[in-house]
Structures are given as C-alpha cells and as structure tokens.
Regions:
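Conserved glycine-rich cofactor-binding loop
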Residues: 16-17
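Conserved NAD(P)H cofactor-binding loop of Rossmann-fold oxidoreductase domains
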Residues: 84-88
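Substrate-binding pocket helix/loop in short-chain dehydrogenase/reductase
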Residues: 91-92, 99-104
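Active-site loop-to-helix junction immediately N-terminal to the catalytic Tyr of the SDR YXXXK motif
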Residues: 95, 141-150, 162
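Active-site helix of classical SDR
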Residues: 115, 152, 160
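Alpha-helical segment proximal to the catalytic Tyr-Lys
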Residues: 120, 165-166
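Residue(s) in the substrate-gating loop at a strand-loop-helix junction
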Residues: 135
Length: 169
C-alpha cells in the first residue's frame, strides 16, 4: 500500500533519532514530502544522507518565535507530527520543580506551540492532520519511575482530544 501519503507536505519534530527518525523513513516510503526538524544538526545531517529527498531544518520546539517563523515560511502543511519529548526517570520524590517544568515545556507546551502556529493554515486550506506522540506511560496503569513523564504524556492526550473536539468536522 505504498503511496498513502503521496505528496503530503509533512513536518516531523524530533526527527533526528528514535520514533521521529523512524516516522520520517516510514512517511518517505509512503510518498510524503517530509520536512524533518530537530535541535541536533548532526542527527539531521545523517538523516539527510540516508534520505536525500527530505528537507531538514534546525528547530528548538521550546522557542515560540522559531516555530512561528517556520510556520510563516512553510505555509499550509498536510501533516504535523509532534514527536519531541523528554523522559525523566524517577518518582514524584525524585522530581524537582525544574524537572517538572522542563518535562511539561518540552512534552506538552511544545505541541501547543506547534499546533498554535500551524493549525490556522490547515484550517484555511480545509485540510490537515495532527499527530501528537504520547506514551503508554499516560495510561490508566502508568509506568514505574516515570512520574513526570507519565503526567506530561497524559496531558498530551488531553490536549489532543481538546483540539480534536474544537476543530474536527
């Protein structure tokens, strides 16, 4: 079933490694026009060598101005795949307030920033899909020693459902 994403203009965050990287490779195999973003220039360069048909862009998803600039330059996209995230290891007692703040900034607020920047053009064009990467750590059971990670990924589920209820027709 190759070609399911043929010519779909796609932006993927945290594309240099892990799930983001695998998503880039899978989307390219399905025919997507991929813009791969990451904060690590070396991982993007390696990805570009392996997949020369993609475009790459350095992007720190914790920086609203950088996201807004990219949205203005890019215009309407068909798929926004929010994959950036951070796993804090530990329980509530191991979690400092700074760990909580960083985890929620990267795992949740960055998705808010990306959606806020790219959704208007999607709505104007009458098309678009948003994928927000969550985790089984957000489930009813959760995972041990992933306190703030699980809490932040549960917030991703809530954010996703709220956006969907407001904008899916």
């Amino acid at each position: 079933m190759a070609g399911r994403l043929k010519n779909k203009k796609t932006l993927i965050t945290a594309a240099g490694q892990g799930i983001g990287r695998s998503t880039v490779l899978a989307f390219v195999c399905e025919g997507a026009q991929v813009l791969a973003t990451d904060i690590d220039p070396d991982s993007l360069a390696i990805l570009k060598e392996e997949c020369p048909q993609i475009k790459t862009r350095l992007l720190d998803v914790t920086k609203t101005e950088a996201i807004q600039q990219l949205a203005e330059e890019t215009g309407a996209i068909d798929v926004l795949f929010n994959c950036a995230g951070f796993v804090h290891h530990g329980t509530l007692l191991d979690c400092e307030e700074s760990d909580w703040d960083f985890s929620f900034d990267l795992n949740v607020r960055s998705m808010y920033r990306m959606i806020r920047a790219f959704l208007p053009a999607m709505l104007e064009s009458g098309r678009g899909s948003i994928v927000n990467m969550s985790s089984v750590a957000s489930s009813v059971k959760g995972l041990p020693n992933r306190f703030v990670y699980g809490a932040s990924k549960a917030a991703v589920v809530g954010l996703t459902k709220s956006v969907a209820m407001d904008f899916i027709k």
